[in-house]
Amino acid sequence: MSEGCTGNSCISWHNLDNKLVVSCPLSVVRNFYSLLTLDDVHEVVSKKHLLWNIKRVIEAEVHLSLHNFLRSQAGFPSWPHHLTMARLVARALRLGRSALIQVGAGCGHQGRYRTSFIASALMWHGSVIIVASETIQQRLLKVEIPRLQQWLPANKSIRTGDIWPSPDFQGLLLISPAAWLKGQLAHNNPFPAHIPTIIDGVDDLEDWVRFQLTEAIQPQDWDQLMLAYPYQVELIREAKVQLTHQLFQRPENPYHCYLISQSEIEILHKLYLSLEPNHLPEIWRNFWQKIPNIRDYSLTSPSEFPLFWATIARRQGLFSLYYAPIELSKIIAPIWQRQPVVLIGSALEPETEAPLFRQRLGLDDVTCLKFAADSQGEAIQLYVPYKLPLPNTPEFQGALIHQVRTLVCLSATAPGMTVILIGDVPLKARVGAILASEFGSRVLVEKTCLDENGILISGWEFWRENQSVLPAPRLLIIATLPLPSLENPLVAGRVAHYKRSHQDWFRLYLLPKAMNELQRAIAPVRENQGIVALLDTRVVNRSYGAQILSSLSPLARLNYLDPSLFSTNNEDDAG
């Protein structure tokens, strides 16, 4: 028999005839009563307590164990949805029904929710796979799992690696997204079917999948092709020279990549027809299998149209070729049919059902849940100036630099880091040089070795990848909305795909991408209820602005800037 008491809340359970019998106050029971069916629960007796005979309902056991664990942990990071999430994950494991959970950007950044799904995975009687990045795996192995193992009635084998341990393995396997997807997309999937799988951090799932499906030809692969066809070296070299000539005639862009043109496709196709297919190196065989799909645009359906691009290194005179599908849903939909999955993300979409995310990834029948943010503990202070020029006007850069300098000066004496997010590469360098001339070594461009009151100037990608190792900023300045730039050839290629399909490319692609990026970028500021200055007036001058502002809730709007906003006293008052 097991028992746990917290104040007046006593919970006990024991096995009786292979069934779990639970006794606990109604106040504790109420939280998970709605998840149990009449077949699961038999009310037995008592006015003050309810005695349940539960037929192996894992939700109840997880709820009660985690409830006692959380009450026993002094100073444990509070999150009001621990028990709800643990029950939903446990229910998905029991029923074999997939689920999609949005925990919110603030919670996603802090990672507090992981206690919930780890508890369910440890207490589940069968094998479970957890797909998470290497960094998250280390956090689970060193912190979350040992802490729970000391309390929960579970003794589960835990393994890490890229392959399934053994046919009779009944433990918990931690695996990276790349290794898991590689196995799932392989012709001979090394993972058994029907293994419940929890995927953490699915905000990046689409990028993970597309990366796994990308075929690449690197400069050294041309040497391998020449070795495979010693009598046709000149033919291969001539095709490479033609491609180099055409690619290096393209005007430079900040992204160093270019969509492949029809004439360049013809060069590759002509080379392919001149070679004996049976002797092709594997990497070339895989790559050339895609070329027939893009030779004739008129014969390719919009849903099958791929991205085909090149990156170039001008100084070295080298180029690489890449192919990746745009539409992923049909390719990966079979994965979700092979095993039940629990997908956990931060802020995928404003809607609980995340319809666009599910459509892009072929997710049909899933239980969807979205947790609300803490309206008091996670609220940011948002400043949006009304009179700044729009980003696409000549006056914008000068006005932006003046506004950034004003903000930095106002907060100069306040403790805490300042982060300035600028997506435009030349503008980022210019702002960095101007601020460094005034504030000296406090200013760094995309470096992590900052002082306590340092000023970091960063692009969106650098900030996303490094915010977990940096202190939460007191002030976050955002130059423009992170709408993917149409000047990026890869973005332009995806937009062209939506246009060919007669779809609203802005509301289906650019806007959701920007909203997700924005919420994740702001998440660290919520830790100390800091200030976010959004200097892109499109949020007040465009119809979609209200949708963006709504996605940033909870927030308090600031109509003016004053040094007192950055004072310690003001911070204490806000808390």
Describe every region a protein language model picked out.
Residues 25-27:
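Short polybasic linear motifs
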